[in-house]
Amino acid sequence: MNNELEEYLDFAKDIAKHAGEVMIKYFNQNNGASYKGDKTIVTLADTEINSYLIKKVKEKYPLHSVDGEEEQFGKSDYVWVCDPVDGTAMYARHIPVAVFSLALVIKGQSMVGVVLDPFTNSLYTAIKGKGAYKNGEKIMVNDYALEDMKTVCHYDLWVGADY
């Protein structure tokens, strides 16, 4: 199973590389931001990345399924879960605080994951039981209690708006 998981990770990294290129391509131009029925924002990058993932999964792993934020495909014990642009609201406003995230869930267990920040060229990867990495370097989680890690952040999305 370990070699298989490494293969899945390589696949996920390839998808992430393409996703990062798409995110950068649309970032400084008209990104086609619009509202979905649930009032959340979607951009051209979201839909293009999601469609690309489904195409590639169908080609390489036709028995797997995809649960993408913008579109789903198939029903399987092997599910690629994707948020093509995690942070779409910021991305749509040309604020570089968004990432691509993809995980492979096998029989309900997250086994492989990648998160790419295309604005800092940071690629985070993990295989269950093998640790987490940033750009190939092992990283560690801290042991702080959650309540000790509270952060408050404020910014104006609409400068000049009459609140």
Positions of PLM-derived features:
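N-terminal subdomain of lithium-sensitive/metallo-dependent phosphomonoesterases centered on the IMPase/IPPase/PAP
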Residues: 1-85
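Residues that scaffold the ATP/ADP-binding catalytic core of kinase and kinase-like folds
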Residues: 26, 90, 135
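A short, compositionally biased
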Residues: 28, 98, 126-130
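Short, function-defining helix-loop hinge/capping sites that tune catalysis or transport
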Residues: 54, 91-94, 125
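Short polar/acidic secondary-structure junctions
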Residues: 71-73, 94, 105, 144
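Glycine-rich active-site/cofactor-binding loop and its immediate structural neighborhood
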Residues: 80-120
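Acidic beta-strand-loop-alpha-helix segment within the catalytic core
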Residues: 103-163
